[in-house]
UniProtKB/Swiss-Prot annotation:
CDD domains: Delta12-FADS-like. The gene is desA. A motif (Histidine box-2) lies at residues 122-126. Keywords: Fatty acid biosynthesis, Fatty acid metabolism, Iron, Lipid biosynthesis, Lipid metabolism, Membrane, Oxidoreductase, Transmembrane, Transmembrane helix. The histidine box domains are involved in binding the catalytic metal ions. It is an enzyme of class 1 (oxidoreductase). This is sn-1 oleoyl-lipid 12-desaturase. Signal peptide: none annotated. It holds the Pfam family FA_desaturase. A motif (Histidine box-1) lies at residues 86-90. Belongs to the fatty acid desaturase type 2 family. It comes from Picosynechococcus sp. (strain ATCC 27264 / PCC 7002 / PR-6). The keyword Transport does not apply. GO terms for biological process: unsaturated fatty acid biosynthetic process.
């Protein structure tokens, strides 16, 4: 994949730092990157609210031939809501958890996303990044698992690992985040609250929208912007950890420090996307510590590049990049890293 800057491998990192711990990397970061600034946090809320309101006003008056780009733009602004809730889920939006929970639930509500289930599952992803036994975000099938799967599962997996990658987060959201029985104890109560909050709000809002706007109005003002959001949700999360050079590891060989530093891709997007999505693409520092607020990610990444730059993966968003990922990174073989479906069929 020519668009990825390939650094020395994780093996090289371990050879040079055989006793490397995540704490050793974190100790090189300035303490200021962890500082929570209420003014900056709420300024990002205001930016997203203004952007979403502006896009919906534009959507209301846009002629039919401009609907597609306006839907896409509106979905991008809604992704800003997700990133605000993302900070809340990592407790880096506010020092007060009740504020994080309140803002997180409200930010996720237009996306019909239960906050606590996402928070818990996403933190599990952070704890076990690129661990084949534990990671719940874009962990690839092995050839053996794929071969043993029912035909329907194979078809869905081929679709979301191919040209329909942008729908993967829809499946992830609906499959994992409404089932509170998959959680235990206090977490089950929290997830049930978040799921019911979304379900009850939807049970009120959707009939009102259908009654006042009609079917086309719901498609125009909710479904298409929501799919625009999921385009970015799927794209960001796929690119964060998926290039042929980045390995997944099984539990017995997994190293936390290597997974967080060299298992995450830094990808540059068009500036307007980065602004509206609050720098969610600056993902390496966020994986080293979830306590870094989104507005401090660039400062943190500058420090990481200075101290650990030779072990980072960097790329720039392009359709060539997405084509390469969706045509190559299908199944995971511990010996060869990713192989494509076509390569697997020839074996």
């Amino acid at each position: 994949m020519t668009s990825v800057t390939v650094r020395p491998s994780a093996t090289t990192l371990l050879e040079k730092h055989p006793n490397l711990r995540l704490r050793d990397i974190l100790d090189t970061l300035p303490r200021s990157v962890y500082e929570i600034n209420p003014l900056k946090a709420w300024s990002r809320v205001l930016l997203s609210v203004a952007a979403v309101v502006g896009c919906y006003a534009l959507l209301a008056i846009a002629p039919w031939y401009l609907l597609l780009p306006v839907w896409f733009l509106t979905g991008t602004t809604l992704t800003g809501f997700f990133v605000i809730g993302h900070d809340c889920g990592h407790r880096s939006f506010s020092r007060k958890n009740w504020v994080n929970n309140l803002v997180g639930h409200l930010a996720f509500l237009p996306l019909i996303y239960p906050f606590h289930s996402w928070r818990i599952l996403h933190n599990h992803h952070h704890r076990y990044t690129n661990n084949m036994d534990e990671d719940n975000a874009w962990a690839p099938f092995t050839p053996e698992l794929y071969d043993d799967s029912p035909a329907f599962i194979k078809a869905v997996y081929r679709a979301i690992r191919g040209k329909l990658w942008w729908l993967a987060s829809v499946i992830h959201q609906l499959k994992l985040h409404f089932n509170w029985f998959a959680f235990e104890g206090k977490q089950r109560e929290q997830v049930r609250f978040s799921a019911l909050f979304v379900i009850i709000a939807g049970a009120i809002a959707f009939p009102v929208m259908f009654y006042t706007l009609g079917v086309w109005g719901v498609v125009k003002f909710w479904l298409m912007p929501w799919l625009g959001y999921h385009f970015w949700m799927s794209t960001f999360t796929l690119v964060h950890h998926t290039v042929p050079e980045i390995p997944f590891s099984y539990r017995d060989k997994w190293n936390e420090a290597i997974a967080q530093l060299s298992g995450t891709v830094h990808c540059d997007y068009p500036k307007w996307v980065e602004v509206l999505c609050h720098d969610i693409n600056v993902h390496v520092p966020h994986h080293l510590s979830t306590g870094i607020p989104s507005y401090n990610l660039r400062k943190a990444y500058a420090s990481i590049k200075q101290n650990w730059g030779e072990y980072l993966y960097e790329t720039k968003f392009s359709w060539e990049l997405m084509k390469a990922i969706t045509e190559q990174c299908h199944l995971y073989d511990a010996e060869h890293n990713y192989i494509s479906f076509a390569q697997h069929q020839k074996r």
